[in-house]
A protein has these predicted regions:
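Structural signature of alpha-solenoid helical repeat junctions
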Residues: 72, 106, 145-147, 184-191, ...
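TPR-adjacent "capping" and linker segments in tetratricopeptide-repeat scaffold/adaptor proteins
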Residues: 63-74, 101, 186-187, 283-295, ...
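Ankyrin-repeat and related helical/solenoid repeat scaffolds used for protein-protein interactions
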Residues: 319-345
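Flexible helix-coil transition and linker loops at the boundaries of alpha-helical arrays
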Residues: 97-107, 136-148, 178-189, 221-230, ...
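Helix-turn-helix repeat elements of alpha-solenoid scaffolds
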Residues: 82-96, 119-137, 160-179, 203-218, ...
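Alpha-helical scaffold segments of alpha-solenoid architecture
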Residues: 206, 214-319, 323, 327, ...
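Flexible inter-repeat linkers and adjacent short helices
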Residues: 1-155, 160, 301, 310-317, ...
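Tandem amphipathic alpha-helical repeat scaffolds
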Residues: 76-86, 109-124, 149-164, 191-206, ...
Length: 365
């Protein structure tokens, strides 16, 4: 793929040397330069390794887009779909899922990522999303390892939307078994990293903090994972310290935000708002000064009012929220001094299996 030889356009001359790029990519200097000079075929996995040492996300995606314009190798296209999905570049992914491919397995990937895009754009949530996945299961070839892993991973997301974190214990082993069958390479790394992030979040919600951090550490050790995945791992790592070490939590939240600020796609902007809002939550419950631009949800605005003894203002905000979550009901119970509502909110936390954030009841009286 000769177009990628233009890598020199996005790396300054003193950075583009065989020793540095070889170290970044784990490719031999000979293999690296033969690839860049077109003597050895460029693969998507190799391209990602080369680009992983560069800071400009926008320029990385320009090179990725150029690569995809000039390749018809479907193995590369399948991995590219997955990488773009995890990176949050939905526009580039849209371009790939609108095409018809020669290989049925590539069309299976295409159909799976169409559903992924529907979920990301909120047109499919909870029960409807699970129904769509169950329908998809009957249409794709589950004997293909990559297809099997993606489908079962999506099922976990569907149950998580419903708060059923315990379903992980059933599916995790099944998915990991299939991942173990995958050949070593970028797709396996992405599969393992996504599963570890899912596991980490489920462990955290069940208050298995040590296991959550161990899963996240495995993700953060991987160099070629998308920046959005790294930022997500850092944000969950930060969450694990919210109640015990707020200073450490804020440190990791800022690391996550520094990664997210380098991204310009819609998914990263939504993630950034979520991380900023969780940072604000951490600050407010520990009476640490908070940046007002970090508060994006009415619930956190109400919580700040409560901490400032402005309960009537908090009540006004919370009463305007329809279908309040358990934590929003809890805030309202504090603002109104309603012990019955507090008990109701507590039981909703238990029912949802959220054993981590239930600690908020001991902090806010």
């Amino acid at each position: 793929m000769n177009k990628v030889a233009s890598l020199g356009d996005i790396v300054s001359g003193d950075e583009l040397n065989s020793v540095k790029l070889s170290r970044i990519t784990n490719l031999s200097q000979s293999n690296l330069w033969k690839t860049l000079n077109g003597k050895v075929p460029m693969t998507f996995a190799k391209l990602v390794k080369i680009l992983s040492g560069l800071n400009s996300e926008e320029e990385k995606m320009e090179v990725v887009q150029e690569f995809l314009k000039h390749t018809d190798k479907e193995a590369d296209i399948r991995i590219a779909m997955y990488y773009l999905y995890l990176s949050g570049y939905t526009e580039l992914l849209h371009g790939l899922v609108e095409k018809e491919y020669k290989q049925s397995v590539t069309n299976n990937y295409r159909d799976i990522f169409r559903v992924c895009l529907d979920r990301q754009t909120h047109s499919l949530r909870s029960g409807a999303f699970l129904k769509e996945i169950e329908s998809l299961r009957t249409q794709v070839n589950l004997n293909k390892t990559g297809v099997n892993i993606l489908i079962n991973t999506l099922i976990i997301y569907g149950y998580f939307d419903l708060g059923a974190y315990n379903v992980l214990t059933v599916l995790q082993g099944m998915i990991q078994e299939k991942i173990n069958e995958m050949p070593r390479g970028l797709e396996k790394t992405l599969n393992e990293s996504e599963l570890n992030i899912i596991c980490a979040y489920a462990y955290l919600m069940q208050d298995e903090v040590k296991m959550a951090r161990e899963s996240l550490q495995k993700v953060l050790e991987k160099q070629e994972i998308p920046r959005l995945l790294k930022a997500t791992a850092l944000s969950i790592f930060a969450e694990s310290y919210i109640f015990c070490e707020p200073d450490k939590a804020l440190h990791f939240f800022e690391l996550s935000l520094s990664e997210l600020r380098k991204l310009k796609n819609n998914k990263s902007l939504l993630k950034r708002k979520l991380v900023e809002n969780t940072t604000a939550f951490c600050c407010i419950i520990h009476n640490i000064p908070v940046k007002l631009e970090y508060i994006h949800d009415d619930a956190e605005i109400a919580l700040q009012c409560i901490r400032q003894n402005k309960n009537s203002e908090a009540c006004k905000i919370l009463n305007q929220i329809s279908n309040r979550t358990a934590i929003q009901d809890f805030y309202l119970s504090i603002a109104t001094n309603d012990e019955g509502l507090r008990r109701k909110a507590y039981h909703r936390f238990l029912k949802d299996g959220n054993l981590f954030y239930i600690k908020i009841f001991d902090i806010l009286k």
